[in-house]
């Protein structure tokens, strides 16, 4: 989405609407062919556009697809990879985009920070408001844009950190964040609040996304046009995904053997039944008070919950291993596309077009979902998935050829520009430092 770097600034291009000034000094307007050529040519990183498009297509599948649970012997179930991993791919892409709009490989100077932060703030608010509108339409899905807007704002303090420091900050959040959130949920006996649901306990959790945003920002400071860098990104991502998946499966089997009363399938079933029973009875129970607090805490099965916060591979569980697995998949996808997207740029043009306007494509998908399924309704039909994908690919390619930047991407770019212009320009400082190495 635009939050994943939708407009031309986010990918480092000069946009696709207007050609450079002609030799005579008059600006020459681009035709369809020139717009499409600019879409897949440097300085735009078309691999990132393709990655965004794949994330959108995966999100559409998660919303409307009829996908069976994963079974190694059932090829159709491999499509279940879209659940959870599509949104995590967006998280890494959002971090890359934040790095690109704040200097690419060059760390921004202190004098640049006020305008850069104001611009990110304006973009984040615009994305948040668009997400609110979509939520109020009753789409029946967990709209990602409100959380995306928060992510852009949360990145303001760290835009001057070097890649090594971004990674050092991401690691403890990924390792400890899920456990701390689960612990706080248990200590509060699962209390609910809209703010906590937005950033900590909902489908999109800050403790899951923050490490991936920081990872993406570190990637965005790297020379992504170098094949060696792309190959290392793909290799590291593949290794992380395989190791996290293997570790999750092995630990689940080991704990189920060593402590079946806590981690075995019967214990999981009993925990689910207890949740249902508690939900059915809580309306008639008065406040428990401190006398019943310990008993209520024990009934939540802390050992099970804390273990799941580390080893669960369930989509949107927010566990430590889910972060490493989904982050690894995202790196593998991005690294692989950095290697092949440029040579295959014309073949991948429709995906590049969709990925250049992901906020628009995502929003159109949600509006179409409301039209087809009614407010609050849902669909599980792979034909709808295919039709939605093809329709968006054609529409986005046509719009890119005729108009360039997507309509909602124009809105967020305008908001970012106006917010940045509202901050007085700082006095010129010393010469900029060299690019990050």
Task: Cite the ranges covered by each PLM segment.
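Alpha-helical transmembrane segments and their immediate juxtamembrane cytosolic regions
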Residues: 2-10, 15-437
């Amino acid at each position: 989405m635009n939050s994943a770097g939708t407009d031309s600034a986010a990918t480092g291009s000069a946009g696709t609407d207007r050609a450079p000034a002609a030799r005579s000094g008059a600006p020459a307007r681009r035709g369809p062919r020139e717009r499409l050529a600019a879409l897949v040519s440097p300085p735009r990183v078309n691999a990132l556009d393709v990655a965004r498009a794949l994330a959108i297509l995966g999100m559409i599948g998660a919303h409307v697809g009829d996908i069976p649970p994963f079974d190694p012997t059932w090829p159709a179930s491999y499509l279940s990879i879209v659940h959870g991993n599509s949104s995590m791919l967006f998280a890494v892409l959002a971090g890359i985009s934040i790095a690109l709009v704040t200097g690419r490989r060059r760390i921004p100077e202190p004098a640049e920070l006020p305008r850069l932060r104001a611009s990110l703030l304006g973009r984040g608010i615009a994305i948040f408001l668009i997400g609110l509108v979509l939520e109020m339409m009753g789409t029946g899905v967990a709209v990602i844009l409100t959380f995306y807007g928060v992510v852009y704002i949360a990145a303001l303090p760290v835009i001057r950190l070097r890649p090594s420091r971004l990674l050092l900050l991401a690691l403890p959040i990924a390792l400890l964040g899920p456990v701390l959130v689960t612990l706080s949920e248990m200590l509060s006996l699962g209390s609910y609040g809209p703010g906590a649901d937005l950033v900590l306990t909902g489908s999109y959790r800050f403790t899951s996304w923050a490490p991936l945003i920081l990872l993406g920002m570190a990637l965005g400071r790297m020379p992504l046009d170098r094949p060696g860098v792309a190959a290392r990104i793909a290799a590291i991502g593949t290794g992380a995904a395989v190791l996290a998946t293997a570790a999750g499966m092995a630990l689940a089997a080991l704990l189920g053997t060593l402590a079946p009363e806590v981690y075995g399938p019967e214990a999981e079933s009993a925990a689910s039944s207890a949740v249902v029973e508690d939900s059915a009875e809580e309306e008639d129970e008065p406040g428990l008070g401190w006398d019943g607090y310990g008993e209520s805490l024990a009934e939540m099965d802390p050992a099970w919950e804390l273990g799941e916060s580390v080893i669960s591979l369930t989509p949107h569980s927010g566990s430590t291993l889910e972060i490493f697995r989904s982050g690894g998949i995202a790196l593998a996808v991005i690294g692989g596309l950095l290697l092949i997207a440029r040579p295959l740029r014309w073949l991948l043009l429709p995906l590049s077009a969709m990925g250049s306007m992901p906020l628009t494509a995502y929003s159109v998908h949600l509006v179409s979902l409301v039209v087809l399924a009614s407010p609050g309704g849902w669909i599980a039909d792979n034909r709808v998935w295919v039709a939605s994908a093809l329709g968006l690919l054609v529409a986005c390619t046509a719009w890119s050829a005729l108009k360039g930047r997507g309509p909602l991407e124009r809105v967020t770019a305008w908001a970012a520009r106006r917010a940045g212009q509202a901050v007085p320009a700082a006095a010129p400082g010393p010469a900029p430092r060299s690019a990050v190495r």
